[in-house]
């Protein structure tokens, strides 16, 4: 396992970040984030990492060189806008936190209503939350056709949660993500569109 990834996970843990936020920051699954925070020190001590089974296999994506630049992000948003040329919709919902910058740029480029969905994994409370909430301009999308935007889809859980929530107040038509790690094409009847998709090829010697 990449040493840099382990060190980043441990640093975020020591800063008080919960597993959900670590997963979001490093573009890994919550399961992998939890594994790294609990076992990171031992993994660093090991001379070589043990062979992982398929259930523990995850892919680390880093696109800091893009998301750190508003100009580069705008170029990505323009690609998504081009993919939206045949989709009729009224609003853009960005999934917090990674999807918000792109959703903002897309809504500005196409002059659409903008809103934010905050998933339950980002709500830190003693009581267990069953869902997230619309964090901005909910009234602007009620009863409207909307698209959902996120940066990376790992397991699809946050996207599924967002779709279920929005179906109660609006009509989600499509989901757009920059990078898809899940291989999922549809959730709750809503199609998933991606710019890039990762996969694992098992090559047996």
Swiss-Prot record:
Classification via HAMAP family: GfcR (MF_01214)
Record note on domains: Contains an N-terminal DNA-binding winged helix-turn-helix domain and a C-terminal regulatory domain (or effector binding domain) resembling phosphoribosyltransferase (PRT) domain.
Family: Belongs to the purine/pyrimidine phosphoribosyltransferase family. GfcR subfamily.
Organism: Methanococcus maripaludis (strain DSM 14266 / JCM 13030 / NBRC 101832 / S2 / LL)
Family annotation (SUPFAM superfamilies): PRTase-like
Biological classification of the source: Archaea, Methanobacteriati, Methanobacteriota, Methanomada group, Methanococci
A biological process term (GO) from this entry: regulation of gene expression
The protein, known as: Transcriptional regulator GfcR
Keywords for this protein: DNA-binding, Transcription, Transcription regulation
Xref: InterPro entries: GfcR-like, PRibTrfase_dom, PRTase-like
MF term (GO), any: orotate phosphoribosyltransferase activity
């Amino acid at each position: 396992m990449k040493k840099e990834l382990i060190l980043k996970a441990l640093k975020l843990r020591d800063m008080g970040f919960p597993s959900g936020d670590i997963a979001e920051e490093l573009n890994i699954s919550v399961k992998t984030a939890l594994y790294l925070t609990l076992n990171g020190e031992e993994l660093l001590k090991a001379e070589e990492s043990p062979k992982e089974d398929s259930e523990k296999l995850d892919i680390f994506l880093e696109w800091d060189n893009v998301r750190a630049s508003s100009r580069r992000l705008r170029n990505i948003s323009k690609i998504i806008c081009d993919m939206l040329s045949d989709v009729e919709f009224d609003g853009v919902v960005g999934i917090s936190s990674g999807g918000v910058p792109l959703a903002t740029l897309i809504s500005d480029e196409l002059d659409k209503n903008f809103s934010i969905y905050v998933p339950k994994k980002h709500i830190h409370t003693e009581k267990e939350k069953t869902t997230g909430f619309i964090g901005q301009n909910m009234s602007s999308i009620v009863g409207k056709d909307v698209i959902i935007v996120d940066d990376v889809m790992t397991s699809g859980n946050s996207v599924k949660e967002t779709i279920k929530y929005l179906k109660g107040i609006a009509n989600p038509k499509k989901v757009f993500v920059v990078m898809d790690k899940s291989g999922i094409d549809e959730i709750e009847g809503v199609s998933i569109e991606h710019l890039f998709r990762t996969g694992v090829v098992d090559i047996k010697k």
